């Protein structure tokens, strides 16, 4: 069982997947930092010095000066500012992944269709080698060699 697991884990696809997950997690942290620390502060400044991470709806009915105070008091809140940051974060990651996949697909070479290796016997309709001059099933002589007889 250990040998089978080792063979499975050492296949190229599993290792590629693990590397992709690690790089994806690191990329996600970079995008989150970009959104929270670089993108949202200027947008908040343009919208009247709004800190999006501090936008919330207090459901308890009491007044709190900040989201941190409401959370510390255990008040139920809807953190829509944090949610907006998460949406922007997701959009940036989705666009980046779309652009990468689009480039990879563009750079992939179009695979050429393989030449046929079999043909159909015109007499018994069996599938035979394309190079056959006589059908191994009905023993009919085939005059057309090298191309399908379908």
Swiss-Prot record:
Intracellular or extracellular location(s): Cell membrane
Name one molecular function that GO assigns to this entry. mechanosensitive monoatomic ion channel activity
> Could you tell me the membrane topology recorded for this protein?
Multi-pass membrane protein
Is the keyword Amino-acid biosynthesis assigned to this protein?
A: no
Top-level taxonomic group:
Bacteria
Which PROSITE patterns does the annotation name? MSCL (PS01327)
A GO CC annotation given for this chain: plasma membrane
Annotated Pfam families: MscL (PF01741)
Q: Where are its TM segments located?
A: 14-34, 81-101
Tagged with keyword Coiled coil = no
Q: What are the entry keywords?
A: Cell membrane, Ion channel, Ion transport, Membrane, Transmembrane, Transmembrane helix, Transport
Signal sequence range: none
The task this protein performs is described as: Channel that opens in response to stretch forces in the membrane lipid bilayer. May participate in the regulation of osmotic pressure changes within the cell.
Q: How does it assemble?
A: Homopentamer.
PANTHER family given for it? LARGE-CONDUCTANCE MECHANOSENSITIVE CHANNEL, MECHANOSENSITIVE CHANNEL MSCL
| Family that this chain belongs to | Belongs to the MscL family.
Q: What is this protein called?
A: Large-conductance mechanosensitive channel
Source organism of this protein record? Syntrophomonas wolfei subsp. wolfei (strain DSM 2245B / Goettingen)
